[in-house]
Amino acid sequence: MQGTLSVWLAKRGLVHRSLGFDYQGIETLQIKPEDWHSIAVILYVYGYNYLRSQCAYDVAPGGLLASVYHLTRIEYGVNQAEEVCIKVFTHRSNPRIPSVFWVWKSTDFQERESYDMLGITYDSHPRLKRILMPESWIGWPLRKDYIAPNFYEIQDAY
C-alpha cells in the first residue's frame, strides 16, 4: 500500500521504495544514497520544511547501515501536519550518504553523531568530525560488530 507522498513521487518518476506505515500511520520510504540529495531538495520545495530528527542504526551484524530522517510538512491553516520517514541504507564497507545539511540545517549535530557512533560519512557536510567520542577513539561504538576495548583511559578534567 502506497501513501500520498509515494504516489506523488512515482508520478514524477522519482525512484523510491515504499516500506509501508509505522504504528502512527506515518509513511516510510526507502531512498537510494545516490538519489537522496536531489529527492531531499524536492521534498523541501514540496513543503517538508522541518526535519524533526535524524538518526542512524546498524541493521544487522555485517549488514547494512541505515540513516533515518523524520520530516514534517508544516503549513498554516492545517491542523494535522503531514509527516514522512525516509530511510537511506548504505554498505558498511564504505558507508557514504550525501549530507542534507544545506537543505535542513538542523542535521548538523545529528549527522555528526551518526558519523561518530556508526561511521557513516555524510558527503559535503561542513564539519563532519567526532562529536561525542574523542578524536583518537578507534572504531564505531554503535555498530553491532564493534568490539569494546578492555580498557578506558580516564583523563583528569583539571
Swiss-Prot record:
Annotated source species: Arabidopsis thaliana
Q: To which protein family does this belong?
A: Belongs to the complex I 30 kDa subunit family.
User: What does the function comment of this entry state?
Assistant: NDH shuttles electrons from NAD(P)H:plastoquinone, via FMN and iron-sulfur (Fe-S) centers, to quinones in the photosynthetic chain and possibly in a chloroplast respiratory chain. The immediate electron acceptor for the enzyme in this species is believed to be plastoquinone. Couples the redox reaction to proton translocation, and thus conserves the redox energy in a proton gradient.
Q: List, alphabetically, the HAMAP family matched.
A: NDH1_NuoC
**What's the name of its gene?**
ndhJ
The protein in question is named NAD(P)H-quinone oxidoreductase subunit J, chloroplastic
Q: Which Pfam families match?
A: Complex1_30kDa
* Keyword S-adenosyl-L-methionine found: no
- Cystines in this chain: none
